[in-house]
Amino acid sequence: MPGTGRRRILDLLAQLPITARVLGNWEDSLWYGVRKELDKTRPSQRYLLRHCQYVLEEISLEEIELLHNQPLQLHRQFGDLTVGISHHLPDKNWGRELIHTGAQEDFDRLVTNPPCDIAVYGHIHQQLLRYGSDGQLILNPGSIGQPFFLDAQLRKDLRAQYMILEFDDKGLVDMDFRRVDYDVAAELQLAKDLKLPYFEVYYESLVNGIHHTHHQEFLRELAQKEGYDRELDAWLKSGND
């Protein structure tokens, strides 16, 4: 969320041998949103609520509860190396502390409590490699669907981002930041076919790398123009999922 995945993405994930899951901010937003507990007056929160309504067309409350019932941080051992995994900070899955210009003391929180040798986090939608104060490795794999760039030239490349870490009995063999092409036109057509709310916002993210999810006036005008406000208000008043 936001996107076309819904049932399809859950079914795909169920086929993969996933051994580590952590709680992200979007899972929190979905959990609160389906309970209609977000701010119903703020355009960005109404944007989230309308997407929660959309998700509920295919995914049950029980499945959303399972998505939400994940730790903020976990650790895995690879030989002598301890790897910490979190969406953002160990005790907070939202905010701007870990953007690329973040304070060193905030990045050190990823590798000190509890201590680990390598920290992997998400949230900022940017591929990143940097170090803790004591030399620990801190990595971010980037974003598959909505990479973020401040630089206009870098923003021209919006391919899906991945990171592959390879370990052997001696330690970390390789770090591989990947970018993979996908059919953006096909995804946008699918979004149209599935009547994805706020299609214009999705288009801007996938095609131009511009993200409007916090642009209050833009979201307000779009919701009124396209009828998302009307659809959301009907759902909020219905008392039904």
Task: Spell out what each predicted region is.
Residues M1-T4, W26-W31, V120-G132, Q146-F149:
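Active-site environment of divalent metal-dependent phosphoester hydrolases
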Residues M1-E57:
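Core catalytic region of metal-dependent phosphoesterases/phosphodiesterases
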Residues P2, A20-N25, S86, I118-H123, ...:
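Active-site neighborhood of phospho(di)ester-bond hydrolases with catalytic His/Asp-centered motifs
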Residues S133-D241:
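Acidic, His/Gly-rich catalytic cores of divalent-metal-dependent hydrolytic chemistry
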Residues T101, F107-G122, Q127, Y131-Q136:
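Functional cores that coordinate and move charged inorganic groups
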Residues E57-H68, Q73:
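Ligand-binding beta-strand-loop-alpha-helix segment within the catalytic cores
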Residues L72-D80, L129-G132:
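Short acidic-hydrophobic surface loop/beta-edge motif
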Residues K40-R46, G79-N113:
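Active-site-proximal segments of metal-dependent phosphoesterases and phosphodiesterases across multiple
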